[in-house]
């Protein structure tokens, strides 16, 4: 297959022996990114004279799909990804061959800036490329194609030329880093027992965002038979085959393209119940005209967590959602595994002490609450570092399970499936790399031993040596594509024993991972997200007059039919607790300020400052004891009132004395998604957590929210310092999603902002006695700064209807009577975007602190997508499209 470019009225053509496929972006502007796909005969194509042969005449392998991208000049462009070279690495039986991707080019359908390098062949020292046919004769043609490519290459000078920087060079680097493998058929991602009706194949397809529209169009328009090798699918992972005498051993590891994160540091699941670091590894033995296959999977603990690093405390586990809020998606994760593999045998390798202990306990708790018998056997196992080769404990523990699970066996001669694997081991440690790979190797060794026992063949030392190298290479490869460094423990697996050199290598790798964990590779993660189409402004390229483009048009026209609007109510409260915990009665007054007449709200957002006493011992301590007390008390009050309205904690966060918790009706917790949280220190120039902000972002249905709890600098004259702290938080508080506070639609910002009433103490106290709130507000520093536009841009505050909330003598209703005689002030405030309708804004008479808590209630409209209605519209549109096409024939 060869590739041609037409510069005028730009289009790209793929040429086979009989047909030409032409891809072009129309000049007519459209709201969607649409291209045309035309299939003509070779004779028709040869009549068109404007096309120029690309890549020095070298044959290409096919396309990985179409990509829509906004270039540096802010012009939106469509790029076609062409796979130019791949190295054949594995072919077994009648399975489609797997080749390692080595060279790709992105051809612009809009601009000619990068055209010159498209006319150059690959460097002369390129290794042979592969083809993707399944016949022996075509495999023999590989060498002929390589000779042709060499002839073309020799015609060109090898001198280096400088080309303009390509907008998609980061994707080129990613796709050719040695971890991507391609095939023409998605079935290469199936396990060997592909006849079994399970396994969602697309989770391993890394170019699904680029190729899905072409896949669908080829199927609907019956183009596939004309261009069987044009569309390529790629997965990321590691593939290797080793030959030993008359047998071979192979390993195919496929990294899932779904999950909360594909790079280091590790994390848990996403809102679709896919976990990060999920890898399916198939161990294949080919001997005596028979193929044996055994599959294992690895993946992080499937609840909402992430690993964090602190200069004070080192690594720690942060849970993004409460255990209760995580359980439903934890269950869904295991139900999908059960559907794909059958019985799930969980092997947990987490440490029971140290910072991993909290994650170990959470995993154990979630597994106990699984509502179905998907997990046949679950146990915790700690690998023995002195026995990297084989651990007798593991063999004893797994003997019955391996016998029950079995393995897949298939005859190459008659292509008959003789047995298949029943169930799968799901293995995890913190990052599912070093420890997990060692255990997977040990299990594969037990499987190999069983296979050879049934064949009545002895396992030789040579075979075990190859097996160790195979799994060590696999561990290193998977670890490198995720962390940039090899697998810890791989040298011990390779040698079958620990060594000084191996220990030093592991120490070096540990430091490498520590660095990557502390300073994540944002560029690599962004390149991955770009490839997968995960950024909010990314949309797939559609083909004109395809069913997909037709359906998108119908969905736009009928959007109001499946977009549902609903009323949503929020109760918010902020309280500087001065290190105190309110009594049960005070908690009731805080959350039910109108007693039994208080409405039940959909969402409760509680912000606390000085949840602990701000002394040095508390600031350097990582204890979350007070946080747990507040969470439990809040839930107790909310759930004791009405049996029909039960609440659960969605997420909470604490940074020293600053706390924020979000609670929602249990009936609504499944519509919450994209929950992340973050902090920003502002104390002592950003080094101390005694002042600063914590924030939680989340989606409720299709509406996004950002909740912030802040504590600013004290003292009446520190206005500029408070303004700077606001700027520091608004500019530098960044969520893991990359969003800042003002990137959200619905913002609720609460806290002890410490802005004071800037007037004489005696006058202020007299105005307080007269209840002259308007006059007091005219002296309020925050009102003044907001009018100037200095702080809280775009946020508004309800009218102040309550007396100043600071500073009181503890346990009394008297303003400060100490020698300092602080001026009464509204330090505690709640601000929101205009999307909120403000219903009530008051303070509570709770006297355990020198502040009074403030609460505000809001209502707003949120939107959700009715998936059943949307699916019905899509189904009707598809039927209408097919009828229209049939009537035009």
Curated annotation (Swiss-Prot):
Listed GO MF terms: inositol-1,4,5-trisphosphate 5-phosphatase activity; phosphatidylinositol-3,5-bisphosphate 5-phosphatase activity; phosphatidylinositol-4,5-bisphosphate 5-phosphatase activity
Database matches in InterPro entries: Endo/exonu/phosph_ase_sf (IPR036691), IP5 (IPR046985), IPPc (IPR000300), SAC_dom (IPR002013)
GO biological process: phosphatidylinositol dephosphorylation; protein transport
Leading EC class: hydrolase
GO cellular component labels: cytoplasm; membrane
Catalyzed reactions per annotation: a 1,2-diacyl-sn-glycero-3-phospho-(1D-myo-inositol-4,5-bisphosphate) + H2O = a 1,2-diacyl-sn-glycero-3-phospho-(1D-myo-inositol 4-phosphate) + phosphate
Needed co-factor(s): Mg(2+)
Domain of life per record: Eukaryota
Subcellular locations according to the entry: Cytoplasm
Induction: By stress.
Pfam families named in the record: Exo_endo_phos2, Syja_N
Main location: cytoplasm
Family: Belongs to the synaptojanin family. In the central section; belongs to the inositol 1,4,5-trisphosphate 5-phosphatase family.
Main function: Controls the cellular levels and subcellular distribution of phosphatidylinositol 3-phosphate and phosphatidylinositol 4,5-bisphosphate. Involved in distinct membrane trafficking and signal transduction pathways. Highly active against a range of soluble and lipid inositol phosphates. Active in dephosphorylating the 5-position of Ins(1,4,5)P3 and Ins(1,3,4,5)P4 and to a lesser extent Ins(1,4,5,6)P4.
Protein name: Inositol-1,4,5-trisphosphate 5-phosphatase 2
Organismal lineage: Eukaryota, Fungi, Dikarya, Ascomycota, Taphrinomycotina
Gene: syj2
């Amino acid at each position: 297959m060869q590739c041609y470019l037409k510069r005028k009225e730009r289009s790209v053509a793929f040429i086979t022996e009989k047909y030409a496929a032409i891809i072009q972006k129309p000049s007519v502007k459209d709201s969607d990114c649409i291209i045309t796909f035309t299939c003509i005969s070779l004779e028709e194509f040869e009549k068109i004279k404007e096309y120029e042969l690309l890549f020095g005449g070298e044959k290409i392998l096919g396309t990985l799909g179409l990509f829509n991208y906004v270039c540096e000049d802010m012009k939106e462009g469509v790029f076609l990804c062409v796979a130019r070279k791949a190295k054949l690495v594995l072919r077994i039986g009648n399975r489609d061959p797997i080749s390692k991707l080595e060279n790709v080019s992105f051809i612009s359908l809009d601009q000619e800036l990068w055209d010159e390098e498209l006319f150059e062949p690959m460097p002369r020292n390129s290794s042979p490329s592969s083809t993707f046919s399944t016949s022996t004769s075509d495999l023999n043609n590989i060498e002929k194609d390589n000779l042709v490519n060499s002839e073309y290459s020799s015609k060109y000078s090898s001198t280096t030329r400088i080309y303009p920087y390509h907008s998609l060079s980061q994707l080129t680097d990613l796709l050719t880093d040695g971890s991507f493998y391609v095939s023409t058929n998605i079935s290469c991602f199936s396990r060997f027992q592909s006849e079994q009706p399970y396994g969602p194949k697309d989770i391993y397809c890394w170019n699904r965002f680029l190729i899905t529209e072409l896949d669908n169009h080829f199927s609907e328009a019956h183009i596939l038979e004309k261009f069987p090798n044009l569309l390529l699918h790629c997965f990321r992972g590691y593939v290797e085959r080793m030959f030993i005498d008359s047998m071979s051993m192979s390993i195919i590891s496929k990294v899932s393209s779904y999950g909360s994160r594909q790079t280091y540091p590790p994390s848990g699941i996403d809102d679709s119940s896919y976990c990060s670091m999920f890898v399916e590894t198939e161990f294949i033995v080919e001997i005596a005209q028979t193929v044996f296959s055994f599959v294992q999977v690895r993946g992080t603990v499937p609840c909402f967590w992430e690993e964090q690093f602190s200069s004070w405390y080192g690594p720690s586990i942060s849970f993004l959602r409460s255990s209760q809020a995580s359980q439903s998606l934890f269950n869904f994760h295991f139900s999908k595994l059960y559907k794909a593999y059958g019985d799930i045998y969980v092997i947990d390798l987490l440490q029971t002490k140290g910072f991993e202990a909290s994650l170990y306990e959470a995993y154990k708790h979630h597994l106990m609450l699984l509502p179905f018998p998907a997990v046949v056997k679950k146990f915790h196992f700690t690998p023995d570092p002195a026995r990297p080769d084989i651990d007798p404990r593991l063999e004893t523990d797994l003997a019955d399970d391996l016998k029950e699970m079995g393995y897949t066996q298939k005859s190459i001669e008659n292509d008959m499936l003789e047995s298949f694997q029943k169930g799968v081991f799901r293995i995890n440690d913190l990052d599912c790399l070093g420890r997990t790979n060692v255990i997977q190797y040990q299990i594969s060794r037990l499987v190999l031993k069983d296979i050879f026992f049934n064949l009545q063949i002895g396992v030789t030392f040579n075979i075990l040596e190859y097996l160790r190298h195979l799994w060590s290479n696999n561990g290193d490869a998977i670890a490198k594509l995720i962390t940039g460094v090899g697998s810890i423990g791989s040298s011990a697996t390779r040698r079958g024993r620990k060594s000084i050199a191996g220990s030093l290598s592991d120490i070096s790798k540990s430091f490498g991972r520590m660095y990557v964990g502390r300073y994540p590779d944002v560029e690599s993660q962004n390149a991955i997200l770009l490839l997968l189409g995960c950024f909010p402004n990314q949309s797939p390229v559609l083909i004109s007059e395809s069913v997909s483009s037709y359906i998108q048009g119908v969905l736009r026209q009928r959007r109001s039919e499946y977009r549902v609007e609903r009323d949503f109510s929020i109760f918010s409260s902020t309280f500087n607790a001065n290190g105190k915990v309110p009594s049960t009665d005070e908690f009731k007054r805080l959350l039910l300020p109108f007693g039994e007449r208080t409405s039940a709200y959909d969402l409760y957002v509680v912000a606390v400052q000085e949840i602990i006493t701000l002394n040095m011992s508390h600031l350097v301590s990582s204890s979350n004891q007070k946080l747990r007390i507040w969470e439990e008390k809040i839930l107790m009050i909310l759930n004791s009132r009405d049996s029909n309205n039960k609440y659960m904690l969605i997420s909470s966060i604490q940074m020293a004395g600053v706390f924020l918790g979000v609670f929602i009706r249990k009936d609504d917790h499944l519509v919450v998604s994209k929950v992340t949280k973050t902090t920003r220190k502002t104390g002592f120039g950003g080094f101390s957590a005694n002042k600063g902000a914590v924030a939680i972002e989340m989606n409720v249905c299709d509406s996004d929210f950002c909740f912030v709890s802040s504590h600013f600098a004290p003292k009446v004259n520190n206005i500029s310092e408070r303004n700077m702290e606001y700027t520091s938080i608004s500019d530098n508080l960044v969520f893991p999603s990359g969003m800042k506070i003002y990137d959200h639609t619905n913002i609720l910002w609460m806290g002890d902002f410490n802005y004071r009433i800037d007037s004489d103490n005696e006058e202020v106290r007299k105005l307080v006695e007269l209840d002259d709130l308007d006059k007091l507000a005219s002296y309020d520093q925050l009102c003044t700064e907001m009018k100037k536009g200095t702080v809280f841009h775009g946020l508004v505050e309800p009218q102040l209807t309550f007396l100043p909330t600071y500073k009181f003598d503890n346990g009394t209703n008297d303003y400060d009577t100490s020698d300092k005689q602080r001026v009464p002030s509204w330090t505690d405030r709640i601000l929101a975007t205009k999307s909120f309708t403000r219903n009530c804004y008051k303070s509570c008479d709770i006297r355990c602190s020198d502040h009074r808590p403030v609460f505000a209630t809001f209502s707003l409209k949120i939107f959700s997508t009715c998936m059943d209605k949307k699916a019905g519209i899509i189904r009707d549109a598809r039927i209408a499209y097919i009828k229209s096409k049939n009537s035009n024939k």
